[in-house]
């Protein structure tokens, strides 16, 4: 039987989701109308695409994937699916902003970042298991 996630793991994950929401959702300059023309539907298709932004978006979701996997170790792709859903939701809020622009590049980068975090957690866990018991 699988152990439930520790309280510490759940709190760490919830805090990171909070950080994502605080940073990504446009809490100011909210408009009563949408800007669907500003949505980048096809990843990497805008001339304004910046490698730096993509790298930062990817790195921003690495802790999300790592903490999700720590909290739910048996859910293989759960971190990627959860990151995709959270990222899609936060990008969607930007449709109502004059200063932010929703981007499928961001959603893809965030999902890849979560996958990297999940794999990093797996690699760390495998090393700890391979090292054998702590005989101190």
Regions found by a protein language model. Name each.
Residues 1-136:
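Bulky hydrophobic segments
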């Amino acid at each position: 039987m699988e152990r439930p996630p520790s309280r510490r793991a759940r709190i760490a994950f919830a805090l990171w989701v909070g950080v994502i929401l605080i940073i990504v959702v446009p809490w100011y300059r909210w408009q009563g109308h949408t800007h669907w023309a500003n949505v980048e539907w096809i990843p990497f298709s805008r001339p304004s695409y910046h490698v730096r932004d993509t790298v930062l978006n990817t790195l921003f979701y690495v802790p999300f994937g790592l903490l999700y996997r720590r909290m739910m170790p048996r859910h293989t792709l759960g971190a990627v699916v959860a990151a995709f859903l959270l990222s899609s939701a936060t990008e969607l809020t930007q449709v109502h902003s004059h200063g932010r622009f929703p981007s499928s590049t961001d959603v893809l980068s965030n999902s890849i970042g979560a996958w990297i975090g999940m794999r990093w957690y797996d690699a760390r866990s495998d090393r700890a298991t391979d090292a054998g018991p702590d005989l101190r």
